[in-house]
Amino acid sequence: MDDMQMRTWAEVDLSDLEHNYRALRGLLPRDCRFLGVVKANAYGHGAVPVAKRLEALGAEYLAVACLEEAGELRGAGIQTPILILGATPAADAPRLLELEVTQAVGDLETAQALSRAAQAAGKRLKVHLKADTGMSRLGFLCDETHLSRAAEEMARAAVLPGLEAEGIFTHFADADGDEAYTMRQFTRFLDLLGVLERR
């Protein structure tokens, strides 16, 4: 390393990552799958080495922010399923299909566009439906006023031809801060699941 150009660096001990993975895995029910978030270069810790270690440990899924990050992992030989948490334009659907990654979908229009693109390619694209329970970024809006509409649109998105809806998730806006707000988001998510289960 050239000290004149790189004045800071991080040394990541992957055995500590392994310890943390095993500790978290031990807290989960046996039928719960583990998704390791490695977006933003694994938060500065090195996406490829972290993803490779998580893959070797048996993590069932990895998550990244964007298509480029997914491409980096696939290019490094990572075979574990990858979820793209951010939005990807339908024009990039051929690359999603080529990489065999899963795309988060936060609105019906995007789902429909991805459906058309997947059908045109003669393939199926895996998607996870994202519920906006209070992050106010990406997702089907699931506050008390929009819950019914969100459930209806998610149900429609889940059965679009060319798509394989394999999951649903939300993003807690302040999970390590405002516990009351996090619980409100969690309640909204459970309410949404209840509405969807009754459909």
Describe the residue ranges of each PLM region:
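Conserved PLP-enzyme active-site core in the AAT-like
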Residues: 27
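Active-site anion-handling motifs in enzyme catalytic cores
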Residues: 24
